[in-house]
Amino acid sequence: MSETVQDKVDFLVVANRLPVDRKVDDDGNVSWKSSPGGLVTALEPVMQRKGGAWIGWHGAPDEVVAPFHHDGYDIHPVPLSAQEVEEYYEGFANATLWPLYHDCIVEPVFHREWWDAYQKVNKRFAEQAAEQASTGATVWVQDYQLNLVPKYLREMRPDLRIGFFLHIPFPPIELYSRLPWREELVEGLLGADLVGFQTPGAAANFQRLAKHRPGVTAARGRARTPDGRTVVIHDFPISIDSRGFHELATSEKVQAEAAK
């Protein structure tokens, strides 16, 4: 596979963080290594098999990093300022949405400036995806930090197939109604063609919210939007890479070790 970053790709993952961490050796040489964590563990085998591009923040504020190729796919870092990290990520994503979605003992905090930063950053991620996607490409948006990206991306590139997956719980309407910007977030997710959740209960909670939107009908895992699109709402519990583990377990090396 080519080591050159492609102009356009047919498959993109859009996530808050990139799947790599930067390493600098004693001589100052920079390399990128796969990050630990559930999201990378779940998606990296897909990226290695399909190729394409991963769009996300590289972890350091106030810095622009050029795109590069890594382990069979392209990496497109999205720059964030220190203030955006504080307001969009540490603020709205992790101090507003995270405790609300998990129904934590810690109360969610609501600040207008956090919400403004969340919108601004989500639009930047959507713009990057719109720029890198080929005609009719599939874009897979990940998790609660990027709830608005599907709608923004739909407005920019209606030709794309857009999926969204939430890796954390989705609360019932009684909890979600506490959020001042709940309508905007639901509309953001309805920009996708498919909205996926970890559990049937989370999918049912979102469907119930969706059908309260003006002009939206929702039932039996489908939502019909005012512009005539059908959005699939379903649960897709993430599993391990069973095929990869089977191949490893049946490899000659492992079988030889097991026979000792």
Residue map of PLM features:
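Catalytic cores of carbohydrate-active enzymes across secretory and cytosolic contexts
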Residues: 1-260
